[in-house]
Design a protein with these regions (language model features):
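Short beta-strand elements at the ligand-binding edges of bilobed clamshell
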Residues: 105-118
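Ligand-binding cleft/hinge of the Venus flytrap
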Residues: 20-31
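Hinge/cleft segment of the Venus flytrap/periplasmic-binding protein
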Residues: 7-11, 15, 25-27, 116-165
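Hydrophobic alpha-helical
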Residues: 22-23, 35-36, 40-102
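Structural signal for short hydrophobic segments within the conserved structured cores
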Residues: 35-38, 111, 146
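Conserved donor sugar-nucleotide recognition element shared by glycan-biosynthetic enzymes
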Residues: 15-19, 43, 47, 121
Length: 165
């Protein structure tokens, strides 16, 4: 069975807490054991330190590193490379171009989960118009995400560039 560690954002942050709950539930459903969770404080350097600590605590045991954002994924990758660890899969979140480029270069960051800001903005305006018209507005509005990997990374980057105009 696969074993994972989670490098999360900041203690007490609602978004970070909800993301953590989702990661843990998905791991449980997939039969992945979560060995530990450490904060990277949403920073590359913080995640590098967290990953160094995790590699020390769990030598040769970590298969997957789940990160709450792409900066922490890059920090985790830096720590793994410094320690000579290459048989590990790191997953980020946000779909930053820098992380996608690492994925395309075959680095340890293998995927990132990209939010869809255009769709999110569109749905916010739709909800605002409904509210102004005194129509019912959904309490929760879910926006899609896209998993970006080596297979679709270049198309994702091309789309990002096209959206810049």
């Amino acid at each position: 069975d696969a074993k994972a560690v989670i490098i999360y954002g900041q203690e007490g942050d609602n978004t970070s807490n909800m993301r953590m709950e989702g990661y843990e539930k998905a791991c449980t459903e997939a039969g992945v054991e979560v060995l530990a969770k450490l904060s990277g404080n949403n920073l590359t350097d913080g995640a590098t330190k967290a990953m160094e600590d995790l590699l020390s605590a769990y030598p040769d045991q970590i298969d997957i590193v789940l990160c709450h954002n792409d900066d922490t994924a890059i920090g985790a990758m830096n720590a793994c490379k410094s320690a000579g660890v290459s048989d590990i899969t790191i997953v980020g979140f946000d779909g930053n171009a820098s992380a996608v480029k690492l994925i395309l270069d075959g680095e340890l960051v293998k995927a990132t989960v990209a939010q869809q800001p255009y769709e999110m903005g569109y749905q916010v305006v739709e909800a605002a118009v409904k509210a102004v018209k005194l129509e019912p507005v959904d309490e929760v509005i879910n926006a899609p995400v896209q998993v970006v990997t080596a297979e679709n990374g270049q198309a994702y980057l091309d789309n990002l560039e096209a959206m810049k105009g």
